[in-house]
Amino acid sequence: MSLIGNGPSVPPSSTKASLFSSPTTSANPTGGLFGSTTGGSSLFAPKTAGSTTTSTTQPTSTTGLGTSLFGTSTTANTQNTANAARPSLFTAGNSIFGTSTTQPGLGASSLTTAATSNQQAQQQQQQRQQHQQAAPTGALFDSLLARNKKQAEGETALGELPSLQLGLADLRQRLRKLGPSSDRPIEPGKAHYFLAASGVDPGAAVRDLGALGLQAKTERTAASVGPAAGPSGVSTTGFGTGLGEVDVDTYLSNLQTKTTLSMIADGLERSARDFDAFLEENVTLEWEAQRKRIYQHFGIKPRDSSVAGTTTAQPTATPSKDGQGTFGRSRRKASQPPPGERPAQRMSILGRSTMMRSVIGTPTRIGAHAPEFSDVEARKDSSGAAVASVDDRFLREKQAKLAEKIREFNDARQRGTPFYICRDLADLESKSGDRHGPHIVEAYRAVMEMVGEHPDAGEAPRERQFAKMYLDPNTQSANALAMRKQILKGATTFLEKQFWNEVNSLIAKYPQDANLGGLPDVVSKIKAYIRLRIARKTLVPDNVELQQINGEYVWAIVFYLLRAGFVTEAAQYVNSNQAHFRAIDRTFSGYINSYASSEERRLKRQMQDRCMSEYNQRIRNAPEGSIDPFRMACYKIIGRCDLSNRSLDGLQTDVNDWIWLQFNLARETDRSLELAGESYGLAELQASIREIGLKHFPKTAAEDTNGSFGMFFYLQILAGMFEQAIAYLYPFSYVDAVHFAIALTYYGLLRPVDAASAGNELLSHNTRSMPQINFGRMLGYYTRDFRAANPAAAVDYLVLICLNADEAAGGQQAQAALCHEALRELVLESREFSRLIGDIRPDGRRIRGVIEERGPLIALGQEDDFIRTITLQAASFADDNGRTTDAVLLYHLAEDYDTVVSIVSRALSEAISLEIGEDPMRLIPVKPRVTNAEGQVEEAAPGSSLSLAAIDDPVELAKAMMGMYERDHMFWQKIREPNRVACSVLLQMADIKSLVEQGRWAECLDKIRALDILPLTARGDPGTIRSYAARFPSLAQPVAINVPNLLMWTVLCCMRQRERLAGGQFAGNESTARLMMDELKQMTVDLMAYTSQLRYRLPPHLHEALARASAD
């Protein structure tokens, strides 16, 4: 049988027992080891359906070999044809490890030809035993009698053995295989089978013997045992125990070794657990959030995890992946909750943010950078490459001016004085030089008309005056209707004033063509404007006849009076020329008077119907070119005729005239009282503007070439589409978008997104399909351009998030929490603690920081709690990052004076632990607080505050803080006694180290004796030395760490002082010098006795130094 299969068949006479069943016979034994053919059988696969089997009873084997491994089989599958049996895989017969009767297959000759003489003898003996058991008892006696006769006659049994027909090479190879191999141990498989058949469990026996603890030596020396070793490397002479392990000393030695190794293993395991716990608790790495951010950065859409139903339905089909080491997930702890169940407060790397993601975003350089919002595309050109931003210098200057204006804006809010934010921002934008700047300026001025911001008249609306009206969720409410009317009225008024300014500027520019003359009233200026347009041939197209009365184009005068918003003046002009107008149109004077007297600029129903009827008749019946186009325009405006065609036919108009006409025709009234053809309000106007934007304006920054996006932004602002306008402008000019959003939010004209929302879109819609802007994060992301250089300016922007923290916006607590979270992240990122949170005066009083100064603007109900909370978080962050001075400052500001002393003691201990002669440890000083307008540090009086002191020496810092606390009992009583004592001792140890460096040995010994830590006054008394040693565990850890250094300094002082006394530098009596030398030597002996009782708590080199000192 071949190992692979398809080998030659075995002879018919070879019949062997199977390993897992009784012997089987095969009609076509050509099956492979791992499969079967049509006519054969495989070891691991069943026979084909075409094979027929019969069952025969087999006898039970007494040896356990040749039959089934798990018991006696009563049936066996045989085929109809008597043929050779299939060899077993593990039995002593035709197996891979025994002698095979088949020819070797391809590539498996070594498995089918190798056999040992022991296996052959066992095979023959088993066959004889089976024949003897099957034979009758008489035949057994006959065989024994014949054998005795042969032995008596001197015959040997060699005749019974088969003849060997092998060469010398074959015999040499067989003999070589009989002996045990030195490089490969003998497999103990057969011994296990024999023991198992006898009812002995080898594994349990080995465990029982190992429990005695007497085989460690044998296992350690198993490599040197050589051939006497068993297969597992353990000597087999004494059931797994060595001969030399029965004595007590060896047993105790082995027990000590095992105990030591067990302690080391337990310590390593405990260290690994502690390290895992430290990583889990202190290193806030949210791999799931990191993976989502990376996916989002590269534009990869993560696989939807909503297939939980399939996973739960088939729990065994797909293994759980939470414990795998896939990207973004940790395999460290299997007890971690799934990513979706983890608390949200650990999603930020900046001190465990309570929001779903960072509010202020990652810091980047100024200029072009990847947008943080998922619905904002990066600015690219037609080829797909990123577009270089405008010169950074101009953008930086613009942002600096805007930041200064925002600072003044917040100052005015704190004082409660009015601030004309739209006017100021429009003035700055007009000086920026941007191509889209004029449109942004016009948009600011349009908002000024909508809200009633008139600086010339001293009128300024209140903060959030229109929030209740604009943010009303019910679109049919009175507030919503009033807001729509105000938007239409403000936009129309702005367009009319814009036209009037254009009229005046053209008359002033071309006075000769205008020929104003006379009284410069409104009508006279309109007449002059018409003369100017006629002179420049821009009034009407060629071949268009206009009606004149006494040389005046009366219809044109009325139209331009209406265009400039002078409706009353237009009615007066018609009434003053009523005779002439009756001659050409008898009903128009009634229409315009009714129009001028109506507050909503609407005609009465009967008059409205008659006006529309006359308009339609003239359009249908009048010959082409016979009607004055200005007359038809006046009818369209006054009677709102033909609303399906909202354009001025036959006139030379510009885009502003067309825009004015759209707003002039729109009305916001009760829709139930209007006819279907007359329904045209703000919603229809917004739909028209939206359609125009999709057709004629760039949709992305890559499509813009000439700044035309500003025009569409201007149209959206006019139409009251404030959220869409901000979202449209942001990819083109995020600086302008942010500040325009600030102005709108200040007046309550921008709907903010829910602060607790997990979305990261700039523009989204609420449940009522109303657009909303992610105002808070837009401000936070904007500050990344400059918050590293000017964190105070970033605070001024972030406090504006609380503009939406009122009842009108809803969720005021959430908006305030968003603002507080942004400020907290800014503090942790910038580390400008002294500027943002506060500073300390020399007397311990605090200096308010920028955040605390803006406290009234950030909706703080309990200001102290928020400042204390953010201060403690920043202090912990600074302490974890090794910024000792920052941590001291912040903990003092948080009034946690005991922690201040602990941190100072720790830093002081580290400084003292350095070896004498090394460079002293330096701390990172606190960033200075005082800065000028250019962001540079101003010179201030030294010692005016902790930040300006620039302390980098731990000893000076400790002295400064302890001196401050000792002078004020309020500070001192809040510090625990152990911390006070520890810091005081460390300061004395710092002085001792300084004296050692200076070589002042006597003074150094006096100060060490005053510390009362070492037994320098014991004079050989063992009880006193033991009492000092017993006090060592009660020392504070920063002090205990430096006790070895103190011992070394003491030994050094004793040795050097003795050398000085021995050198004759003592001017006193010789006997006194000798007594002092003996006393110094006794000190070293006492110190040696002291260290001997703290043997395992002190370094070894200290014992060596003491031994040398005592020997001298």
UniProtKB/Swiss-Prot annotation:
GO terms for biological process: poly(A)+ mRNA export from nucleus; protein import into nucleus. It comes from the Eukaryota. It is a peripheral membrane protein. InterPro entries: Nucleoporin_int_Nup93/Nic96. It holds the Pfam family Nic96. Residues 1-74, 101-136, 303-350 are annotated as: Disordered. Keywords: Coiled coil, Membrane, mRNA transport, Nuclear pore complex, Nucleus, Protein transport, Translocation, Transport. Residues 39-74, 119-135, 310-319 have a biased composition (Low complexity). The keyword Isomerase does not apply. Residues 113-135, 394-415 form a coiled coil. It is found in: Nucleus, Nuclear pore complex; Nucleus membrane. One of its GO terms (cellular component) is nuclear pore. GO terms for molecular function: structural constituent of nuclear pore. Its main location: nucleus. Belongs to the nucleoporin interacting component (NIC) family. Functions as a component of the nuclear pore complex (NPC). NPC components, collectively referred to as nucleoporins (NUPs), can play the role of both NPC structural components and of docking or interaction partners for transiently associated nuclear transport factors. NIC96, which is localized to the core of the NPC and the distal ring of the nuclear basket, is required for de novo assembly of NPCs. Component of the nuclear pore complex (NPC). NPC constitutes the exclusive means of nucleocytoplasmic transport. NPCs allow the passive diffusion of ions and small molecules and the active, nuclear transport receptor-mediated bidirectional transport of macromolecules such as proteins, RNAs, ribonucleoparticles (RNPs), and ribosomal subunits across the nuclear envelope. Due to its 8-fold rotational symmetry, all subunits are present with 8 copies or multiples thereof. Part of a tetrameric NUP192-NUP170-NIC96-NUP53 or NUP188-NUP170-NIC96-NUP53 module. This is Nucleoporin NIC96. It comes from Chaetomium thermophilum (strain DSM 1495 / CBS 144.50 / IMI 039719). The gene is NIC96.
